[in-house]
Amino acid sequence: MKVIDLIRNSKSTAFSFEILPPLKGNSIQKVYNVIDKLKEFDPKYINITSHHSEFVYKTLPDGSFQKVNIRKRPGSVAIASAIQNKYGIPAVPHIICKGFTKDETEYALIDLNFLGVNNLLILRGDIKTLEASQQNPELYHDHATDSQ
């Protein structure tokens, strides 16, 4: 069901919550443990935040540094699908247009459609930390409305 319809048709205040994907190396079970504790409150939907990659500096064997682009957390696509399939609660993954290239955004939307995740929250994302989108603006959407 579409979250907008759940909100529109609700006779009382609806409860929802937001999940921060676990750091890489953790399993989906960490997310399930949180949801298991909160599902008694009958959430109408669950938001899944999304975090863009960030640059870190890796020390090379010769003592020099290399700038590396890494993601510390899994994306919201897989987590949204896992939550929706396990619990039957609509999932709302966040898609940040400044954190992903236009192609990455398109692929995420194709995957979400394929997985039956129909609710999205599309955001611009933080500008100050997104060096890549500033260096290659033609590859990124400037605003969420550009994703349409």
Regions found by a protein language model. Name each.
Residues 1-17, 84:
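N-terminal amphipathic alpha-helix/helix-capping segment at the start of soluble metabolic enzymes
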Residues 9, 60-93, 141-148:
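Alpha-helix-loop-beta-strand connector modules within alpha/beta enzyme cores
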Residues 22, 44-74, 127-139:
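Glycine-rich, proline-tolerant flexible connector loops at the mouths of alpha/beta enzymes
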Residues 1-4, 32-36, 76-81, 109, ...:
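Generic structural signal for well-ordered alpha-helices
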Residues 26-32, 97-114:
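Glycine-rich anion/phosphate-binding loops
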Residues 33-49:
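Catalytic domains of carbohydrate-active enzymes, especially glycoside hydrolases
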Residues 13-21, 44-48, 91-95, 120-122:
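Hydrophobic faces of well-ordered beta-strands that scaffold small-molecule active sites
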